[in-house]
Amino acid sequence: MSHLVKWNGRGEVVIEQICLDSVRIKEKMKEIVDENILNEDLKVKLISFIKEKKQFSFAELAYYHYIAFDGKNDKAIELLASGIELLILSADIFDDIEDKDNLQASWMKLDPSIATNAATALYTLSLQVIGSVSNHPKLLSLTLQYSLQSLQGQHVDLNLTASSESEYIEMIKLKSGSLVTLPSILGVYLATGEYNETVEEYSRYLGIVEQIANDHYGLYYPNYNDFKTRHTLAFNYLKNKFNQSSIDLLNFYAQENHMINNLEDLKGKLRESGVIQYLNVIKNLAVENFKESFKKLRLDEQRKNKLLIQLLRGI
């Protein structure tokens, strides 16, 4: 992770940065476990969990914000990004255990008590790593703040207490929005030593967008646990029973309808029910709210535009 400084021929300096190296982040995570976990069996299990990890989007969020706010210490942001991904991995494991989801993952094939202890070790190790990145104590306190907010959102989710669209959105802001906000805020704080309210605001909306994408994905996979528990924004829409397709889908997800026999039938019912259109509307509203909030970011225009492109990639 480094910077290239070039002249664009008009007397202006153009700053280019090499993208975050996900392979290096994964190796750094394994190094951290190897150096800090003494129990060999636990070490082997944690490293195997890390090897399964394929996405490093939270590390990217931290890195993009660090670079946008003129951070210059590549080793510091690499360590922070690795610590954040350890935290996210622990959160994924806890989430799978609590939801009884993602059964193909290696941690879901272990005794739940072993998997829970391993996830706790990962979470504790992540805090140790993040706390070691900088002398700023607030780096760790911000991590705890957003982790606690996300856990409260997860509590609402597990308790099945959200029943209206607005309650679901608030739950998503806490559960998913807090986890998206964490790396963005930490990246800025590591670069500047300051908390940025605008970054928190627009990151919450990014969290909503990500969760809606997960809900959309789950519609095509009946064994996806959130649909078995009937606790998603999509299911909240379907239970209004606006049409026969909605009723058919409710029965299908409850495994009481054998009329939907293949993916094409399922896609047809989803279109007819209106749930896909509904999720797209909610997602587009969140994207627009993100863009409006992002406009308030006080940053050099070149850096701001590059950050916007990076954050919107894949949305």
From Swiss-Prot:
EC number(s) reported in the record: 2.5.1.-
Enumerate the InterPro entries for this protein: ComQ (IPR033965), Isoprenoid_synthase_dom_sf (IPR008949), Polyprenyl_synt (IPR000092)
Where does this protein hold Mg(2+) 2? 95, 99
**Record field: catalytic activity:** L-tryptophyl-[protein] + (2E,6E)-farnesyl diphosphate = (2S,3R)-3-farnesyl-2,3-dihydro-2,N(alpha)-cyclo-L-tryptophyl-[protein] + diphosphate
Question: Per its record, what are the GO molecular function terms?
Answer: metal ion binding; prenyltransferase activity
Q: Which domain of life is it from?
A: Bacteria
Q: Outline what the protein does.
A: Part of a major quorum-sensing system that regulates the development of genetic competence. Involved in the maturation of the competence pheromone ComX. Acts by catalyzing the transfer of a farnesyl group on the ComX pheromone. In vitro, can also catalyze the farnesylation of single tryptophan and tryptophan derivatives.
Please report which protein family the annotation says this sequence is part of: Belongs to the FPP/GGPP synthase family.
Entry protein name: Tryptophan prenyltransferase ComQ
Q: Which organism is it from?
A: Bacillus subtilis subsp. natto (strain BEST195)
Lineage runs: Bacteria, Bacillati, Bacillota, Bacilli, Bacillales
